[in-house]
Amino acid sequence: MTTPTPSAAAPAMPAAVIQRDGQRAVFDACRIRSAIARAGAATGEFGDTQAALLADEACRVLAYRWPGGAPHIEQIQDVVEQTLVAARHMATARAYMAYRQRRATLRADAQTLVDVQSSINEYLTRADWRVNANANQGYSLGGLILNVAGKVTANYWLSHVYAPEIGQAHREGDIHIHDLDMLSGYCAGWSLRTLLTEGLNGVPGKVEAAPPKHMSSAVGQIVNFLGTLQNEWAGAQAFSSFDTYMAPFVRKDGMDYAAVRQCMQEMIYNLNVPSRWGTQTPFTNLTFDWVCPEDLREQVPVIGGEEMPFAYGDLQAEMDLINRAYIDVMTTGDAKGRVFTFPIPTYNITPDFPWESENAGRLFAMTAKYGLPYFQNFINSELKPNMVRSMCCRLQLDLRELLKRGNGLFGSAEQTGSVGVVTVNCARLGYLHAGDEAALLDALGRLLELGSQSLEVKRKLIQRLMDQGLFPYTRRYLGMLRNHFSTLGVNGINEMVRNFTRGEQDITTAWGHAFALRLLDFVRKRITGFQERTGHLYNLEASPAEGATYRFAKEDLKRWPDILHAGTPGKPYYTNSSQLPVGFTDDPFEALARQEDLQTKYTGGTVLHLYMGERISDAAACRELVRRALTRFRLPYITVTPTFSVCPVHGYLAGEHPYCPLCDAEKLAAKRQAIERQQQARAA
């Protein structure tokens, strides 16, 4: 080892040490001397005097490499190893290396253990943050079972499936591997036409249903199908062209509006019952064509094994009935007026969309009030309506191009979806490589490579488990993961820009915006390479990362207290993907203009939320907002998000209200009446 050349002013010793949990501790040279002395005594190669000299040498190297800095504990131990080797104390060096390896193994084993008592008690006392992490899962026995099982499954993935460097990158917050608590794929889109034509059947030993002949039985099979498949996947389950494929039942049975509405009510209610593992509501998405797609117009539907004497293109009136009924039920809500969360509706907006129709008025009235729907832009984006079905029949996929997954953030096109999602902590990269874009992109490339490796491992494992029968219904209706994407996401690009420039720029400035575009182009180029190398589909997603964004920020603050973040020191977070900072603008068209070229870089799920401070004045205003957004901008998906409150007594209230104004008014009126009665009693 080469000793640093002495200078007039010796470098300052490191000020701190980064521990394995990310916490900072005061640098203590005595601990290095003690460790070397114990190692020398164990081998008999040297005593305390030589140990002190070796410790001084190691400290000089540390001061030279990290003057006044904060090396990681592993980096300090690396220097100690190098010092022992340079001094030719080979027996001690080998013993020290073996000791480090044993300790690393013990730490890894400890991470795979789950403390049964604390895990159960943390859930029962609600001390575990996971109890409230999922809005779709309530505090329940099923939630307890899922919580404890999820910890075991996550440790299995990180310690026994993924390579050590992948597990380490996740644990230390460089990347976030989503849905580690489930030994399954992420999300899937299914062919509703296949279900309606073949029925819910084909799994040995399970009850079988023939193809439905009426809408009521079709609705029952849809609910059972989505609920059953949800148990085999971690994320959203989706059907496309719902109104197109269900319309033949309306025509065949001559159903009136009341009958169609009853069927929609039964379906929507049953899909909001917490029937999923962990007492959760199934996460479901339905895509509505509104106007029959061109590639289906001449095709003949089959009901109960019989071809119908009409084509899908003949059923616009029936599609209108279905859309009207669905919107009516979703707008009305449950028995107490509470809005239904699922299925999330996605509407395909094509050039022939009837903006001025009565149904369109109902759709935008619902949107103005609740903001439920997602709108898929087939007017002015790269998306094409037939893409939702093209994935299952393209025999030769061009892996040199990045394909669109279709149907937005929570939906998937027919017979496709995502095997898994890995999100990169971009804010950390901006901090660590401030001012050096080449170094930042190089580090990003390494993390993307780790993400790709983890997704390839997951794809192989899930396919093998499917072949073994662990996912019987997925095996029956899908069979293989050929058309499923491996998804990579980014998080905290706004904070990446801020940290990279030490707070001088953010994503809203021209420079920061251009930097974000360069980063997304870099990611797209890398995942194109992954496609060509692996033969598997990849996409870039603006991953929601609701939990990951807080986890990233908390991990980074432990290591670097001066890192820039959103939120407060107690509740830090990073801005999702490449979104604008929270509260930056209340002008939806400014948000659209600033996000247009960023949003079009994503090939997987992405959606721009147009946040409104309160309910939009009327359906016409909402319709014009959506129309202008989709015709003037190239964003693939948007959703309107008005602010509203729900009172347990009075239900829906436009705008944000910490307390119900109607309840307050009633209490004041009651108080006044009581005072008046008291005054009258005294007067009498």
Predicted regions and their residues:
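Catalytic-loop motifs flanking and including active-site residues across diverse enzymes
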Residues: 28, 32, 238, 420, ...
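Well-ordered alpha-helical scaffold segments within catalytic/enzyme domains
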Residues: 495-503
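Core structural elements
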Residues: 79-85, 289-290, 472-496
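Conserved catalytic cores of very large enzyme subunits
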Residues: 105-482, 503, 509-681
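Charged, amphipathic alpha-helical regulatory modules used
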Residues: 2-119, 123, 480
